[in-house]
Amino acid sequence: MKKLLCAFFAGVLTCSLTACSEDEDPNAPTYTETSDVEVALYKLLPESSGKAASCRSRKVGEHYYLACNYISMGTAPSSLYVFYYDKVKDPVKRFYALNGKAMSLYDGQLKYEPILGNYKDSFGLPLPESINMGEVMKVFEFMRK
């Protein structure tokens, strides 16, 4: 129950700081879409882990990305799971696992989440020049502190 309340209040705080702003970009991930991913990650945690899933979206260049990790009091945050956001490719899927950690998690435990996909399977490789993983990871570095 504590984890659920923490996730709820983190979501409310996120909404008040980002998604509920007046100058919202219509191409950006919505609060609901981001929350759906956060809940999917939260469901993977053991009952008494004391951890919560945390996701943040950012625009890097011409694309939006979502980075998620697990957080808990007194421990360093987990590695980042990075997803590419696209609402045109598929009528349901919105976030596509982009980095190795996200692809492994998707293939192993999140394959049946309707909002999620795998970038490699959906768009193919190599990544286009407009996606610079170094820049993307740098933008989300704040989540690792």
Per-range role (PLM):
Residues 1-4:
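Positively charged n-region of N-terminal signal peptides that target proteins for export
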Residues 6-14:
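Hydrophobic helical h-region of N-terminal Sec-dependent signal peptides
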Residues 15-19:
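C-terminal motif of bacterial Sec signal peptides marking the signal peptidase cleavage site
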Residues 21-23:
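Bacterial signal peptide processing site
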Residues 30-50:
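N-proximal, solvent-exposed amphipathic alpha-helical segments enriched in charged/polar residues
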Residues 44-104:
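Mature extracytoplasmic domains of secretory-pathway proteins
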Residues 103-145:
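C-terminal partner/receptor-binding element of secreted or periplasmic proteins
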